[in-house]
Amino acid sequence: MDSNTVSSFQDILMRMSKMQLGSSSEDLNGMITQFESLRLYRDSLGEAVMRMGDLHSLQSRNGKWREQLSQKFEEIRWLIEEVRHRLKITENSFEQITFMQALQLLLEVEQEIRTFSFQLI
């Protein structure tokens, strides 16, 4: 995994956890949790690609991995929409920068997961 991506995830998660968005802090915590889950999933897919022999163990361990992959893409799309919405409504420059970087990272991760999945298919 790219070390820049790891630090980007960590940086964005740290900054998002410091944000106070009033009544929507519960939503923000949900976004943070999904970001972390997405990072772990992307990492595990990347590791499986690196050990191409793991394709069979990945498939046998999780017979529904294509369904899981589809679910992750849905989560990414939801997060992208949520981040775009937050970006539109916030006037705080710190939050704007954080959400712009989160959006960029989500788009990069979506592309990485897509690339990994094509290699595994």
Swiss-Prot record:
Residue ranges spanning the membrane: these are none
One record GO biological process: exit of virus from host cell nucleus through nuclear pore
Q: Which GO cellular component terms are attached?
A: host cell nucleus; virion component
Keyword Membrane included in the entry's annotation:
no
Indicate where this protein resides in the cell: Virion; Host nucleus
Organism's domain of life?
Viruses
Keywords in alphabetical order, please.
Answer: Host nucleus, Host-virus interaction, Transport, Virion
Pfam families named among the record's database cross-references: Flu_NS2
Q: Where is this motif: Nuclear export signal?
A: 12-21, 85-94
Other notes:
Average number present in a viral particle is estimated to be 130-200 molecules.
Family per record: Belongs to the influenza viruses NEP family.
Q: Which HAMAP family match?
A: INFV_NEP (MF_04067)
Q: What quaternary structure, including any partners, is listed in this protein's UniProt entry? A: Interacts with protein M1. May interact with host nucleoporin RAB/HRB and exportin XPO1/CRM1.
User: What is the protein's known function?
Assistant: Mediates the nuclear export of encapsidated genomic RNAs (ribonucleoproteins, RNPs). Acts as an adapter between viral RNPs complexes and the nuclear export machinery of the cell. Possesses no intrinsic RNA-binding activity, but includes a C-terminal M1-binding domain. This domain is believed to allow recognition of RNPs bound to the protein M1.
What protein am I looking at? Nuclear export protein
